[in-house]
Amino acid sequence: MDPGVLRDDMVDSLEHESKGCVQSATVGGAMRTVPREAFVEEERGAYADRAFERLGTRVLAPSTAARLFEALAPEEGDSVLVVGAGVGYTAAVLAEVVGERNVHAVDITRRLVVEARGNLADAGYEGVLVDRRDGADGLPEYAPYDRILLEAAALSPPAALVDQLADDGRLVMPQGAGEQTLVVVEGDEVVERLGGVAFQPMLVEGEQADTVERNRTRREDREFARRNAEAGAGWEQDWIDWDGA
C-alpha cells in the first residue's frame, strides 16, 4: 500500500476527536510528510499507533510523538535541540517545521547516533546535526535554543538545558520517576502539565545499553548524599562506599 496513504490515515486518526493528539495544521502537515517507515524498518506496521523497540531504545508511538510536538509548539525558523535522538524520527518531523539545519539532536548511545544519522540522510534530512553527547549537558555550541525536547524522564529539568534555552524558549520533558507527567518549562519553571506519560529514564555516561557496567545506583547515591549533606546526621557513611565512588 502507498506509504503516503498510510501516513494520511495515521494522521487522520490522530486528529480525530477520539484521540485528539494532533491539533495543529503545522504538526499534522509535518507528520503527513515524514516517511516513518524509513525509521522503523517496516512499511505498514510503521503507521500503527504503537511503539517499536530498536537498538535498545523505544521508537515512540505516533500518538505520543504528536503530544510532544504539540506541547513543543515549534515555529518556522526556530532553533531546536532534541535530547534523545533515538532513531531520528522526531528530529525529522521537527525539521519539516523549522528547517533541517535548525535541528540539533544528541544521544548518549553511539550506535543510535549512527543509526539516526543514516536514517535522517536516507529520508532526506541530512542537514540535521546529530552528535553523541550526555543529554544532561545539552549542546552548548549551538545554544541558545528556542525549543528543547527531552525524550527521557527526569525529576527536574537539567540545569544545563535550562541555561541553553533562549529567553522566550520552551522546554518539553517527561517529569517524574514512577509516575511521569509531560510538562512545559519556560525559564526555570514548569508552566504547563499535560497529563501522564511513560518514558525511559534519562541516562548519563556509563548507563547506555551497550555499556557493560551501569552506574545509576552509584550516581543516585552521590546525588542523594549531596542533597542531604546539610542534615549533618552522618547517615550517609553507613551505606555509601565513598572510597570506591
Feature roles, as predicted:
Residues 74-183, 187-188:
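Conserved nucleotide-cofactor-binding alpha/beta core module
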Residues 21-23, 36-69, 73:
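Conserved SAM-binding loop and adjacent beta-strand
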Residues 1-42, 218:
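N-terminal auxiliary segments of SAM/dcSAM-dependent transferases
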Residues 1-6, 172-245:
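SAM/dcSAM-binding transferase cores
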Residues 29, 66-70, 92:
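N-terminal, well-ordered alpha-helical segments
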